[in-house]
UniProtKB/Swiss-Prot annotation:
Entry superkingdom: Eukaryota
Compartments in which it is found: Nucleus; Chromosome
One of the protein's GO biological processes: spermatogenesis
GO CC terms: nucleosome; nucleus
Protein name: Sperm protamine P1
Region annotated Disordered, chain positions: 1-69
Family, as annotated: Belongs to the protamine P1 family.
Amino acid sequence: MASYRNSRSRSRSRFRRRRRGRSRVRGRDARQGRSSRRRRRGKGRAHSGKKGRRSGSRRRKRNNNTENK
């Protein structure tokens, strides 16, 4: 992002392009919001295996703590 701040002329030209296609950007934002939810679900499933392994070790530790208590 620092490159955008350093090159102000480029950022202005890019903002002008974004201002011209605001309707398209809004439509894309709505689609991205839906796709992001699907992608988040997909990422959740993809990482769920890793999280399941980590949480499994954490659950075992919690169970060990309850057993020790």
